[in-house]
Amino acid sequence: MLILPIVKGEYKKDYNLKHLTWFKVGGNAEIFFKPLDSEDLKSFLIQNKQKLPIKTFGAGSNIIIRDGGIEGVVIKLGQNFSNIEFIDNHLIVGSSCLNYNLAKFCQANAISGFEFLVGIPGTIGGGVAMNAGAYGSEFKDIVVQIEAIDFAGNFLTFTNEEIGFKYRSNNLPKNLIILKVIFKINKGDSENILLRMNEINNARSSTQPIKERTGGSTFANPEGCKSWELIDKAGLRGYRIGGASMSELHCNFMINNGDATAKDLEDLGNFVQQKVCEDSGVKLEWEIKRIGRHP
């Protein structure tokens, strides 16, 4: 018998995650949990005596939920974890804050260095987890430290150096939930910041399928080259499996054309990975996470 910890937040059983993802595919979470606050989350983790499997969920922008759903508990940090505040010349930002919202906040307050976030879908916590970056900047350039909690309910802090940022990854422990991110502040000019953000938005709209059901870049760039160039060279621009295809506009983006399953998308990515390796001798590494059970 499944015994859930007593919490102040919200549980939902057999919860459909599809509508929370950008691809709009996937199965259900056995248990979906939105904690009220950090102490509520800590209480849940300490009480998790059955050691229910735990997955964390952000904005659903770079993830494929497999069609068989997710066993155990999916934890999503809601609006209570999205605050932005000034403390001692630093920004303290809740991990569920959207990258776009932080970029707009910084522009309004003449804080430079965050312009690139306007072009990165997802949350601040997810951005730290994968060292997200675009247009010449990455999270490693602006993060001072993070506050987090492990699955045993211990609050922890990690400095930029301790995080160990790498290209699209880091050295943080796996069983960790990021709660807050502390950023350094560099003052700038609001008008210049806005101009740069507009440049980024214009570049995205002209080169990426941002109006489609997509999950961002499918594969990380190998050292010294671009994934899209290798995919294009292998003749896979527009290639389709079921309801999923590689974008004609930017062939490192997968698209759900309306009737794709999670299996279609994952099969397409695996096929592209195989064909690029055969064509160029380079094995592309997934940037999009795939989690859950196969049906």
UniProtKB/Swiss-Prot annotation:
GO molecular function: FAD binding; UDP-N-acetylmuramate dehydrogenase activity
Pfam families: FAD_binding_4, MurB_C
Keywords: Cell cycle, Cell division, Cell shape, Cell wall biogenesis/degradation, Cytoplasm, FAD, Flavoprotein, NADP, Oxidoreductase, Peptidoglycan synthesis
GO process annotations (BP): cell division; cell wall organization; peptidoglycan biosynthetic process; regulation of cell shape
Domain FAD-binding PCMH-type: 24-188
Cofactor(s) named in the record: FAD
PROSITE patterns found in the cross-reference section: FAD_PCMH
GO cellular component: cytosol
Main location (coarse class): cytoplasm
Active site: 168, 217, 287
Matches recorded under InterPro entries: FAD-bd_PCMH, FAD-bd_PCMH-like_sf, FAD-bd_PCMH_sub1, FAD-bd_PCMH_sub2, MurB, MurB_C, MurB_C_sf, Oxid_FAD_bind_N
Top-level class of the enzyme under EC nomenclature: oxidoreductase
Superkingdom per UniProt: Bacteria
Localization of this protein: Cytoplasm
The protein's annotated pathway: Cell wall biogenesis; peptidoglycan biosynthesis
Recorded catalytic activity of this chain's protein: UDP-N-acetyl-alpha-D-muramate + NADP(+) = UDP-N-acetyl-3-O-(1-carboxyvinyl)-alpha-D-glucosamine + NADPH + H(+)
Entry's EC annotation: 1.3.1.98
Matches recorded under NCBIfam families: murB, PRK13905.1
Family: Belongs to the MurB family.
The protein's role, per its UniProt record: Cell wall formation.
Protein name: UDP-N-acetylenolpyruvoylglucosamine reductase
Species for this entry: Rickettsia rickettsii (strain Sheila Smith)
